[in-house]
Amino acid sequence: MNKTAKLIDHTLLKPGATEFEIKTLCAEALKYGFASVCVNPFWVKLAASELEGSDVKVCTVIGFPLGANTTEAKVFEAKNALENGAQELDMVINIGAVKSGLYELAYHDIKLIRDLGKNFVLKVILETTLLTDAEKIKVCELSACAEADFVKTSTGFAGGGATIEDVKLMKANISSGMQVKASGGVRDLETLTKMVEAGASRIGTSSSIKIIESL
């Protein structure tokens, strides 16, 4: 059970999440041994306090969910999150820049956050449902050049989620030290297993407990 739990970012990103729900999320992560909790930036400080001294990481999102912030805003948001206790950052690429062929801009979004340090895990969210396969490959290459740790399929807010095909494509187009996070629509053990078999080594889901208790 614990091995599967360690694949999961226990996620609560809905805008109406309450303090009680965040505390419950953290307690669940401690109980089941999830890799991290993934919360919105406002809740990072609380999550860090609740998880202090444990091996459950605090993950938050940057430029979420649209990715359309300026690079400067994303860098500030990332720096602020790290100061508040975040250990993993899931940042959304500038999707419009990628689709416009403005790859240098998209690269700098990632690189300037990476330049904040190597003491945190950086995951780059592609939002695969909005990209062509060629664009997905390009973002994987940019992420590798910027020394990101992961590429991630989706925010879960754009109408599409992780697919087996996308996970395989992403895995095939990242550097050997990088990993893939599948997120969006992973709600049961069968889907999680398929994502892992396709090459994902981290899963983002709000159905974590349902999955673990089905083992």
Swiss-Prot record:
Source organism, top-level taxon: Bacteria
Keywords of this entry: Cytoplasm, Lyase, Schiff base
EC id: 4.1.2.4
Example GO BP: deoxyribonucleotide catabolic process
Coarse class of the protein's main subcellular location: cytoplasm
Active site feature: D90, K152, K181
Membrane spanning residue stretches: none
GO cellular component: a single term: cytoplasm
Catalysis performed (reactions): 2-deoxy-D-ribose 5-phosphate = D-glyceraldehyde 3-phosphate + acetaldehyde
Localization of this protein: Cytoplasm
Record protein name field: Deoxyribose-phosphate aldolase
Organism of origin: Elusimicrobium minutum (strain Pei191)
Organismal lineage: Bacteria, Pseudomonadati, Elusimicrobiota, Elusimicrobia, Elusimicrobiales
